[in-house]
A protein has these predicted regions:
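Basic/aromatic-rich interaction segments and small domains that mediate binding to polyanionic partners
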Residues: 4-6, 10-56
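C-terminal structural segments of small proteins and small subunits
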Residues: 52-75
Length: 75
C-alpha cells in the first residue's frame, strides 16, 4: 500500500486539505480498520497527523525520487 495519497475531496476541511495535493499517510492499522487515514495535513501542528475518512483520498504510487523528496520535506 502506498505511503502517499492524493486529496480528492476537501469539502469539510478546505483550510486543512488542498484538493489535488499529495499527502503523506502515516501507518495506523486501527484507523484503517474504520476506513480512516492518518494524514499530515496543512496545519502540521500535530506531528502524529489527523484522522480523515479514507474516501477523501486516493492512493498514489510515486517514483522513488519523489517519495524521498516528500519525506525529506516532512523531516
Amino acid at each position: 500500500m502506498s505511503n502517499f495519497v492524493i486529496c480528492i475531496n476537501n469539502d469539510n476541511n478546505p483550510a486543512s486539505l488542498i484538493l489535488g495535493k499529495v499527502y503523506r499517510k502515516l501507518p495506523d492499522v486501527e484507523a484503517e480498520a474504520h476506513d480512516m487515514f492518518r494524514i499530515i495535513d496543512e496545519d502540521k501542528s500535530e506531528p502524529d497527523g489527523y484522522l480523515y475518512p479514507s474516501s477523501m483520498f486516493a492512493p498514489v504510487e510515486l517514483p522513488e525520487a519523489a517519495e524521498r523528496a516528500l519525506l525529506a520535506a516532512d523531516a
